[in-house]
Regions:
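Hydrophobic transmembrane alpha-helices and immediately adjacent juxtamembrane helices
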Residues: 1-280
């Protein structure tokens, strides 16, 4: 069996084992995959929609103008990416006993953790698509192929981040704690709870008050859109909430970040993987 086939086989088998054990012993089992996203959306919609009176952009083709649905798409997409990176980062340290006893391609641990999470994410996307069908019509069904491509790109990005951070956490155990702090900041910097139009308004208001850079408004929106997580969230919202294809700039950004980070992560992992067991 070639190395590539072995990696794929081990990845699938380990992901299946993780999936089968995830809800083992719970009364509701796989139903939690449907309950969790709905509950999460309800909480965020209540806090940021009702209490803080958040506003959502109007869907391009769907005509939807619901903050609950808008933030719902962002929350489940963010949770997938954030949880995937966290799981990938913890894969090596969390399986140190296995790594010191059995030899197998180390990257399989990161691949399988993200693949198992993607399985749950597929259920959550199904819930969102069903809700969007009810709220905005069947137009969202035409976006499913695009959503699949976006998810595959997001998986590449998440795996790449997992590869980088998993190696870093082996050599520097504080990385896991630092990441939890950074992750909170990153969430709010990715537009999970506020729209691009709200940010544009802030930029315009600041310019009106004299906050400029070389006579031009502060490049808040430009910097904001360099954030890879924001690009993926924008792509998901465009398709699932707006029933429209993302702009070519968003597509280009998602592809560049996905393959760039995955490639970088693979290089770093390959460079340091030989010494992982020694450090563990």
């Amino acid at each position: 069996m070639s190395e590539t086939k072995r990696v794929i086989d081990l990845t699938v088998r380990m992901a299946q084992r993780s999936i089968s054990s995830e809800f083992k012993g719970t009364a509701l089992g796989r139903l939690w995959s449907f309950i969790n996203p709905i509950a999460t959306i309800a909480v965020y919609a209540l806090i940021f929609g009702v209490v803080f009176r958040g506003e959502a952009d109007k869907g391009a083709n769907s005509g939807l103008s619901s903050f609950a649905l808008w933030i719902g798409v962002g929350v489940i997409a963010w949770n997938f990416m954030s949880s995937g990176i966290q799981r990938g980062m913890d894969s090596l340290v969390g399986n140190s006993g296995l790594l010191t006893k059995v030899y197998f391609p180390r990257q399989v641990l990161i691949y399988s953790s993200v693949l198992a999470l993607a399985y749950d994410f597929a259920f959550e996307l199904g819930v969102i698509i069903l809700i969007m069908c009810i709220a905005g019509g069947p137009g969202v069904l035409l976006m499913i192929p695009a959503v699949i491509v976006i998810t595959l790109l997001a998986m590449l990005f998440v795996i790449g981040m997992g590869l980088i951070l998993s190696v870093a956490s082996v050599y520097f155990r504080d990385i896991s704690h630092l990441w939890q702090i950074f992750n909170q900041i990153w969430m709010y910097a990715s537009g999970v709870v506020f729209s691009l139009s709200m940010l544009n308004k802030v930029q315009t208001d600041l310019a009106a008050k004299g906050w400029t850079w070389g006579g031009e408004p502060l490049p808040i929106v430009t910097i904001f859109r360099l954030n890879p997580a924001e690009l993926f969230l924008e792509a998901y919202r465009s398709t699932l909430y707006g029933f429209a294809m993302p702009s070519w700039q968003v597509w280009l950004g998602c592809v560049a970040w996905a393959f760039g980070i995955f490639g970088l992560g693979s290089l770093i992992f390959r460079r340091f993987s030989a010494r992982i067991v020694e450090e563990l």
